[in-house]
């Protein structure tokens, strides 16, 4: 069975090319869980311009939760965002993971100017029952 060629679209098919936006100021949302770190850079309206995660960068399993994986994910997202003209970001950090501070530092090192830093971790007012304690 022959496989369809990837690349050029078929005749009459619409293509969706990613247009380069010019957004000088944005927001960096860092979601750091115990298993992964996701960095999304958005415009002021909240539309995602660039994103990267520890898994997307190439880490698997328990290595996704390391600060080094978060650093590479943040650098990757910052590089993509700078192609769209982002120069300054406000940082919103969510979650208890180990890659929080490392991701913020690597956004600065990648050349983005960091404005405000806010912790937006959701706090339950005694909502769902937490998972059972681990016994190792």
UniProtKB/Swiss-Prot annotation:
Q: What species does this protein belong to?
A: Mycolicibacterium gilvum (strain PYR-GCK)
Which BP terms in the Gene Ontology apply to this protein?
translation
Function field? Located on the platform of the 30S subunit, it bridges several disparate RNA helices of the 16S rRNA. Forms part of the Shine-Dalgarno cleft in the 70S ribosome.
Q: Where is composition skewed (Basic residues) in this entry? A: 7-20
GO molecular-function annotation terms? rRNA binding; structural constituent of ribosome
Q: Which key words tag this protein in UniProt? A: Ribonucleoprotein, Ribosomal protein, RNA-binding, rRNA-binding
UniProt protein name: Small ribosomal subunit protein uS11
Transmembrane portions of the chain = none
Per the record, the similarity remark reads:
Belongs to the universal ribosomal protein uS11 family.
Q: Where is this region: Disordered?
A: 1-31
Q: Which InterPro entries match?
A: Ribosomal_uS11 (IPR001971), Ribosomal_uS11_bac-type (IPR019981), Ribosomal_uS11_CS (IPR018102), Ribosomal_uS11_sf (IPR036967)
Q: Subunit structure, briefly?
A: Part of the 30S ribosomal subunit. Interacts with proteins S7 and S18. Binds to IF-3.
**Could you name the Gene Ontology cellular component terms for this entry?**
ribonucleoprotein complex; ribosome
* Keyword Metal-binding attributed: no
Q: Which NCBIfam families match?
A: PRK05309.1 (NF003698), uS11_bact (TIGR03632)
